Amino acid sequence: MKTFKLIKLNILKESGEDFQKRSIPLIDGLIINREDDQNRWIIEAYLDKQYIEEFLRFRQNEEEMVLEAKITKSSNHPAVFLVKVLDVNEIGEHFNVLFMGNIVDHKKDQVEHMLRRLIEEGYQGEELLEEFKNRVEQAEAENSV
């Protein structure tokens, strides 16, 4: 197993074809690659008690959630996980929430989605390649702001 510091945590909720991102302020957190046969990860987030009801609902309903996590340094690209809440524990004025799930190959999905959209817009051949490069550069510029 490998353990990393959790720097930032966002909940991603589907909104049409995209995701809405909501930041959850961390007090502290860890992320563990279990390196098991199912490639599962455990995420532990230590949070202010104002968020406890939401995570208790997720646990009770056994809902899958999509989380975006920055690991080790805030300058790292975020990793996307499909998880379920394992447990929620009150700790004084705070609580911890334990998630278990798998990392999602988000970049591959984004590339496929962008290519599909370009083809639907009528691009093909060399024009498709050029427009794809332009949009990738544009997306990277928007994400670096």
Report residues per predicted region.
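Mixed-charge, glycine-accented linear interaction segment located at domain edges/termini
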Residues: 103-145
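Short secondary-structure transition/capping segments
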Residues: 6, 10-17, 45, 112-125
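Charged, low-complexity, helix/coiled-coil-prone segments
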Residues: 1-8, 24-27, 54-58, 62, ...
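Short peripheral tails and domain-boundary helices/loops at the edges of structured domains
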Residues: 84-108
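Intrinsically disordered, low-complexity acidic/polar segments
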Residues: 52-54, 76, 92, 106-110
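N-terminal "first-domain core" detector
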Residues: 1-43
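Compact, well-ordered interaction domains used in eukaryotic information-processing assemblies
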Residues: 32-83
